[in-house]
């Protein structure tokens, strides 16, 4: 009878049957070995990425950090167009949208008031569409006039 070999645990099971494999795979040692295997694999992938990035930088393939915000990464400014800085703390100019109305902050003196209930987003959506339907497409009318 063939034996089942577990690559993570580096061991043979007594025999190849679903119940033995299930028992083995739910065991603590097997789960720890699987976790260790993938942690090691992720560390190797991260190190490979670091090495490849370092080699590309040394070879001159990476010339500038795209997140640095230097002059080469910024889009060119159109000539003649100037956007004034925002007014910090000043009232908005006429025609500019202001801040939306914000309710006053609750303080400990407002003990008789309760916060508004939080709506469940799923409750506002309604029931899900039947399986096999395409979102946004109306289903055909089955019992319509003939």
Swiss-Prot record:
GO terms for cellular component: commitment complex; U1 snRNP; U2-type prespliceosome. GO terms for biological process: mRNA 5'-splice site recognition; spliceosomal snRNP assembly. A zinc finger (Matrin-type) spans 4-36. Its main location: nucleus. Pfam families: zf-U1. It comes from the Eukaryota. The keyword Ribonucleoprotein applies. Component of the spliceosomal U1 snRNP, which is essential for recognition of the pre-mRNA 5' splice-site and the subsequent assembly of the spliceosome. U1-C is directly involved in initial 5' splice-site recognition for both constitutive and regulated alternative splicing. The interaction with the 5' splice-site seems to precede base-pairing between the pre-mRNA and the U1 snRNA. Stimulates commitment or early (E) complex formation by stabilizing the base pairing of the 5' end of the U1 snRNA and the 5' splice-site region. This is U1 small nuclear ribonucleoprotein C. It comes from Drosophila pseudoobscura pseudoobscura. The gene is snRNP-U1-C.
